[in-house]
């Protein structure tokens, strides 16, 4: 309910003058957090959502125990969604126009950044950094990417007359109708660290459980390149402070939703703001703005 909800509501990423925008304190966003708090007080939100881990979440999706889901995208979601759909052909989770901006902003869903899906580091304690680098280089190559996505030609996929990759009938049948076994035996296209979307263009195969969701998202993606990788450098005092602030914000969000009334909501929010100020917040924002300026230079803006 952090950046994903903010993107859904179209919360800006920068001020009119190009400086960093404090999305967590956006009035439109906080109005929706208040709405969720009201829903919690009325018994419409279960306490389970605050404690379910990844495994519990997947199990509940597979059995349709969530009345609704709020997710930022479909990566790593297709498996449990497909299990539910296969077992219940007349029931499926679909994307809908849910929370909307109260000030007229259109959804601005995030997409892959200039630096790729994620930034990876090789630890200074790595026993063989050269081998680690070779592994990364292999996996980000076209050959490695296609291997992660489709497996081995002739065993898990074939190439049709149009040059498109197709999973073999046996593999596709397992993926669609016995996804747990598919993940155990093949686990294709689920190596999230190297889940490059460009390899989707090699195939017309789709996972039925996510087709409608992906179609719903068409036209809603907006680049956020200018705020990419703007956090303080690792091991710096500001990085440690930001880590503490982010952890505090995660617990604050839970407390905001579970607050007993508006007064308690305001008090919890004020405590978080005070926590930020006591942890060099101004210094962190200064770094945000400096790195945003550097990003603009890279983008030629």
Residue ranges and their predicted role:
Residues 1-301:
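Extracytoplasmic/secretory soluble proteins
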């Amino acid at each position: 309910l952090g950046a994903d909800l903010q993107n859904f509501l179209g919360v800006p990423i920068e001020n009119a003058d190009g400086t960093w925008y404090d999305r967590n304190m956006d009035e439109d966003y906080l109005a929706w957090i208040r709405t969720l708090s009201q829903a919690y007080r009325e018994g419409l939100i279960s306490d389970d959502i605050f404690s379910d881990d990844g495994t519990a979440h997947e199990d509940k999706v597979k059995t349709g125990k969530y009345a609704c889901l709020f997710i930022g995208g479909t990566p790593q979601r297709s498996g449990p969604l497909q299990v539910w759909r296969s077992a219940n052909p007349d029931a499926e989770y679909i994307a809908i126009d849910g929370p909307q901006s109260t000030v007229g902003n259109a959804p601005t869903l995030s997409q892959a950044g200039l630096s790729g899906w994620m930034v990876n580091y090789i630890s200074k304690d790595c026993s063989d950094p050269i081998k680690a680098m070779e592994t990364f280089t292999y996996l980000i190559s076209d050959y490695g990417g296609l291997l992660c996505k489709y497996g081995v030609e002739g065993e898990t996929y074939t190439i049709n007359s149009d040059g498109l990759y197709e999973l073999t009938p046996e593999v596709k049948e397992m993926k669609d109708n016995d996804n747990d076994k598919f993940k155990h035996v093949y686990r294709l296209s689920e190596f999230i660290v190297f889940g490059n979307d460009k390899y989707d263009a090699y195939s017309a195969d789709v996972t039925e459980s996510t087709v409608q969701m992906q179609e719903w998202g068409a036209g809603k993606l907006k680049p956020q390149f200018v705020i990419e990788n703007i956090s303080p450098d690792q091991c710096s005092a500001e990085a440690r402070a930001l880590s503490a602030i982010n952890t505090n914000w995660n617990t604050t969000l839970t407390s905001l939703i579970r607050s007993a009334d508006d007064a308690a909501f305001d008090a919890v929010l004020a405590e978080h703001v005070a926590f930020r100020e006591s942890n060099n917040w101004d210094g962190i924002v200064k770094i945000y703005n400096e790195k945003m300026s550097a990003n603009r230079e890279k983008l030629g803006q």
